[in-house]
């Protein structure tokens, strides 16, 4: 299970997740498609998925407890990426409304999002360091760094990095 902050009792999260319906996807099945709206959150029980955006893999997820579809659920919008299974995978399934109804699950998802923001911030710092170290001044890289800075600063977060989900 991903790191659960000390303010959430581990057993409380596990108990709530264990009550959610279980679904299984076979290898190479689409779990979410970008542009669709499912109103569901999936919590990986076992297996592996790839997350792709515009045909580019942005993550492989294998850690039990990882949450998928949380951005769509929290922002009440369509999924922003494609999620596809790499092997037979099991998920606990929750309606998006669970985030409004269950503060423990909401805090769990918030902690996961905070970890991901922390990772993205670290990636930006690393990229900026590489750009400065190698005196890379290409417009594309510069624009990418600037865009990441804008996105992250809009959250009010400090730029730090740590391993995550």
Regions found by a protein language model. Give the residues of each.
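Heptad-repeat positions
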Residues: 117, 124, 131-134, 138
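Short beta-strand segments in beta-sandwich/barrel cores
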Residues: 30, 48-52, 90-91
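Cyclic-nucleotide recognition modules
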Residues: 18, 59-118
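Glycine- and acidic-residue-biased ligand/ion/polar-headgroup-sensing regions
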Residues: 39-55, 64-66
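Structured alpha-helical
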Residues: 56, 123-126
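Phosphate-/nucleic-acid-contacting segments
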Residues: 133-165
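Conserved short histidine dyad/triad with adjacent acidic residue
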Residues: 21-36, 61-64
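Cyclic nucleotide-binding regulatory module and flanking cytosolic helices
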Residues: 1-29
């Amino acid at each position: 299970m991903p790191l659960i902050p000390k303010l959430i009792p581990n057993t409380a999260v596990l108990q709530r997740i264990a009550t959610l319906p279980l679904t299984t996807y076979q290898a190479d099945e689409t779990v979410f498609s970008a542009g669709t709206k499912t109103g569901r959150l999936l919590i990986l029980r076992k297996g592996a998925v790839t997350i792709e955006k515009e045909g580019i893999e942005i993550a492989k997820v294998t850690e039990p407890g990882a949450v998928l579809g949380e951005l769509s659920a929290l922002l009440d919008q369509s999924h922003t990426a494609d999620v596809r299974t790499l092997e037979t995978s099991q998920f606990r399934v929750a309606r998006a409304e669970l985030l409004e109804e269950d503060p423990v699950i909401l805090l769990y998802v918030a902690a996961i999002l905070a970890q991901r923001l922390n990772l993205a911030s670290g990636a930006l710092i690393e990229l900026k360091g590489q750009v400065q170290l190698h005196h890379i001044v290409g417009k594309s890289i510069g624009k990418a760094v600037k865009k990441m800075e804008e996105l992250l600063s809009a959250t009010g977060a400090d730029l730090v990095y740590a391993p995550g989900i």
